[in-house]
């Protein structure tokens, strides 16, 4: 019986969400490293998708760029792609090319052209363990 169940078992990658955010009004111009708290990558992962949400919609399209540090937060560089929340919208979704990250890497994000509007953003980085 156990062998029969094993043959029916389908293994799928389980997605994990790493979430970071910033409280208050979004930046009015390009502003790097905006996360209120840096996010540790908990294990070796392949990042797959991005989602962003805001409590108050921005008056102009706002781009969030994921940034990564491999040196304990000493420096951050753009990584993994961007997600855009369009003018007057509250959510954005993106499917950039996959990126492998390592346990202990730190994630942050930059904001471009927030128009000084929109409030309280959450950035969701979705990935699978590798």
What kind of region is each of these model predictions?
Residues 45-56:
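A short beta-strand element within beta-rich, extracytoplasmic domains
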Residues 109-116:
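Short beta-strand-plus-loop segments that form exposed binding edges in beta-rich domains
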Residues 28-43:
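Short beta-strands within extracellular/lumenal beta-sheet-rich domains
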Residues 1-30, 55-57, 61-63, 67, ...:
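Glycine-rich, low-complexity segments
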Residues 45, 103-105:
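Surface-exposed loop/turn positions
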Residues 90-103:
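Short, surface-exposed tryptophan/glycine-enriched loops
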Residues 116-122:
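Extracellular carbohydrate recognition
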């Amino acid at each position: 019986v156990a062998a029969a169940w094993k043959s029916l078992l389908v293994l799928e990658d389980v997605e994990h969400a790493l979430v970071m955010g910033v409280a208050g009004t979004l930046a009015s111009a390009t502003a790097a490293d905006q996360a209120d708290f840096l996010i540790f990558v908990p294990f070796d992962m392949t990042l797959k998708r991005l989602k962003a949400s805001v409590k108050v919609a921005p008056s102009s399209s706002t781009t969030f760029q994921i940034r990564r540090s491999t040196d304990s937060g000493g420096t951050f560089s753009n990584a993994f792609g961007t997600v855009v929340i369009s003018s007057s919208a509250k959510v954005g979704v993106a499917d950039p090319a996959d990126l492998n990250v390592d346990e202990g890497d730190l994630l942050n994000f930059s904001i471009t052209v927030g128009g000084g509007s929109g409030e309280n953003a959450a950035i969701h980085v979705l990935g699978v363990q590798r």
